[in-house]
């Protein structure tokens, strides 16, 4: 199971638009993995520490974006240490990277960027050499997307290659017209329990993009079951008397085309 934290007041107050979530979903999907949850958090130490404490206890793989710098509003490193009940220590590999980056201009403030919870390992930063860190299965990278992206990919390819394609999934959906979601509940309930490992979903649209009002109705999950579940769903909608058409493919999934 993979989770994500996107950290920073600048996201919550609208000064910056998050670019991490869509990237992480795609980075996982192209490796046959899936994101199970994501939380947005501000720069509040107590809330951060509580969140880290919960996910550390769950032993989940988590990517955390932002807040690992050394300015007064960066709290991630300290809160991870508090959640794990360990000390912050200057990591020797991080110190080497920072000194190699700044040379004679290395200062105590810059070295603080290499203080990680005791027991951490570093995540190399190919952009400016200031590393992120992993603590257990939690991986902490900067809030700058151009730095975070190669660092996340390095972690995935280094730490989780053995899991690639474990969660390969496919999706199949239709656009149902002249029906509201409540009118499609029976069709969804008729299909879901019959196919363990497949989720039935609905996504209504008011036609904001110029299309007809419709409900996207579909199934996603185990590729071996999706086609059969999709046919069962279409059959239920057809029997209910609602017109429908095939939906466009969704990026990041092995979509199957409705028969």
Labelled PLM ranges:
Residues 226-228, 244, 248:
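Mixed-charge, glycine-accented linear interaction segment located at domain edges/termini
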Residues 7-9, 64-72, 142, 203, ...:
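Glycine-rich beta-strand-to-loop/alpha-helix junction loops that act as flexible
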Residues 47-50, 74-163:
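Proline/glycine-rich low-complexity loops and linkers
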Residues 248-257:
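Short, low-complexity, charge-dense intrinsically disordered segments
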Residues 40-43, 93, 111, 179:
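Short beta->alpha linker loops
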Residues 137-236:
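An accessory alpha-helical subdomain
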Residues 1-38, 43, 227:
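Glycine-rich phosphate/diphosphate-binding loop of Rossmann-like nucleotide-binding domains
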Residues 25-83:
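N-terminal small/polar loop signature for handling phosphorylated ligands or for N-terminal nucleophile
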């Amino acid at each position: 199971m993979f989770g994500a934290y996107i950290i920073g007041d600048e996201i919550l107050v609208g000064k910056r638009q998050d670019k991490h979530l869509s990237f992480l979903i795609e980075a996982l999907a192209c490796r046959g993995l899936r994101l199970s949850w994501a939380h947005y958090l501000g720069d509040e130490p107590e809330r951060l520490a509580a969140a880290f404490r919960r996910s550390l206890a769950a032993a989940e793989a988590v990517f955390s974006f932002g807040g690992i710098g050394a300015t007064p509003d960066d709290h991630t490193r300290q809160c991870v240490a508090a959640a794990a009940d360990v000390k912050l220590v200057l990591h020797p590999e991080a110190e080497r990277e920072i000194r190699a980056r700044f040379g004679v201009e290395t200062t105590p403030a810059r070295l603080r960027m290499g203080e990680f919870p005791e027991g951490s390992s570093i995540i190399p930063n190919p952009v400016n050499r200031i590393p992120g860190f992993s603590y257990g299965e939690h991986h902490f990278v900067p809030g700058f997307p151009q730095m975070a992206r190669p660092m996340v990919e390095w972690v995935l390819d280094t730490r989780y290659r053995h899991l690639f394609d474990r969660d390969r999934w496919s999706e199949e959906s239709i656009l149902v017209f002249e029906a509201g979601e409540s009118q499609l509940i029976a069709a969804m309930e008729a299909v879901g329990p019959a196919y363990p490992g497949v989720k039935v979903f609905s996504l209504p649209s008011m036609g904001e993009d110029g299309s007809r009002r419709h409900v996207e109705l579909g199934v996603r999950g185990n590729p071996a079951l999706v086609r059969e579940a999709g046919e069962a769903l279409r059959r239920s909608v057809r029997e209910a008397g609602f017109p429908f058409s095939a939906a466009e493919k969704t990026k990041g999934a092995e979509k199957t085309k409705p028969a």
